[in-house]
UniProtKB/Swiss-Prot annotation:
<feature type="binding site">
    <location>
        <position position="132"/>
    </location>
    <ligand>
        <name>(S)-2,3,4,5-tetrahydrodipicolinate</name>
    </ligand>
</feature>
<keyword id="KW-0220">Diaminopimelate biosynthesis</keyword>
<comment type="similarity">
    <text>Belongs to the DapB family.</text>
</comment>
<keyword id="KW-0520">NAD</keyword>
<feature type="binding site">
    <location>
        <begin position="74"/>
        <end position="76"/>
    </location>
    <ligand>
        <name>NAD(+)</name>
    </ligand>
</feature>
<feature type="binding site">
    <location>
        <begin position="98"/>
        <end position="101"/>
    </location>
    <ligand>
        <name>NAD(+)</name>
    </ligand>
</feature>
<dbReference type="InterPro" id="IPR022664">
    <property type="entry name" value="DapB_N_CS"/>
</dbReference>
<keyword id="KW-0028">Amino-acid biosynthesis</keyword>
<dbReference type="Pfam" id="PF01113">
    <property type="entry name" value="DapB_N"/>
</dbReference>
<dbReference type="GO" id="GO:0050661">
    <property type="term" value="F:NADP binding"/>
</dbReference>
<dbReference type="GO" id="GO:0019877">
    <property type="term" value="P:diaminopimelate biosynthetic process"/>
</dbReference>
<dbReference type="Pfam" id="PF05173">
    <property type="entry name" value="DapB_C"/>
</dbReference>
<dbReference type="GO" id="GO:0005829">
    <property type="term" value="C:cytosol"/>
</dbReference>
<dbReference type="InterPro" id="IPR000846">
    <property type="entry name" value="DapB_N"/>
</dbReference>
<keyword id="KW-0560">Oxidoreductase</keyword>
<comment type="function">
    <text>Catalyzes the conversion of 4-hydroxy-tetrahydrodipicolinate (HTPA) to tetrahydrodipicolinate.</text>
</comment>
<feature type="binding site">
    <location>
        <begin position="141"/>
        <end position="142"/>
    </location>
    <ligand>
        <name>(S)-2,3,4,5-tetrahydrodipicolinate</name>
    </ligand>
</feature>
Amino acid sequence: MDLLIYGVNGHMGSLIKNLAEKDSYWRVIGGVDSEMSDDPMNNRYDVVVDFSHPSALQDVLQLCKEKKIPLVIGTTGFSKEQLEDIKFASAKIPILQSTNMSLGMNLLFRLVEQTAAVLKDKSDIEVIESHHNRKKDAPSGSARTIVESIEKGLGEEKKHQHGRVGECPREKGEIGIHAIRGGNIVGYHEANFINDLETIKIVHEAHNRSVFAQGALDAAKFIMDQEPGLYTMKDLLNLMV
């Protein structure tokens, strides 16, 4: 199959390219970034993987819609309007979008949702994420997805408390969200469900960024067989169970 990578010279794009080159499943591997292009409009690709920048979204969607190419989106930091654009495009092409391509991390999303559904309001919930000192956004997209998964399990949205300073007693029902930045931490996320008798701690730690690249290639293989619609890594997990 022929693969096109948007953001091919970025950290994730280059990892995906290197892994794909070692997998005989991929026959042609093309790349697009801000400095070079394989002229995707003049070539036919079987799937596109996007790890570029939110500013490139319209170009990516236009290409995939015109050429009817399935799309995997790993880019984060989209505006609400851009998320709506993705949803609209998924009516014409299959799109898999995920804030984290690690299968293990997506298992964590499922586990925190199930835990929240059982415990309801019986625990204080705190989410902690740690990343390298070059990461620009906080909290991470994965931390946001953890909170969304928790709220889905609870059946309602909660107040989000981003860090604490000074006198700020914990409000009942709020979800604390905390970000740590330092060194070369690849990615660490934990969800804590705490009450007076016990703490349930659900943790995922990525040891190497290749785990995200492999997940992206797994997602690419999955999305090529799907009908138009908006998918997540949870759909891929369901297929594996």
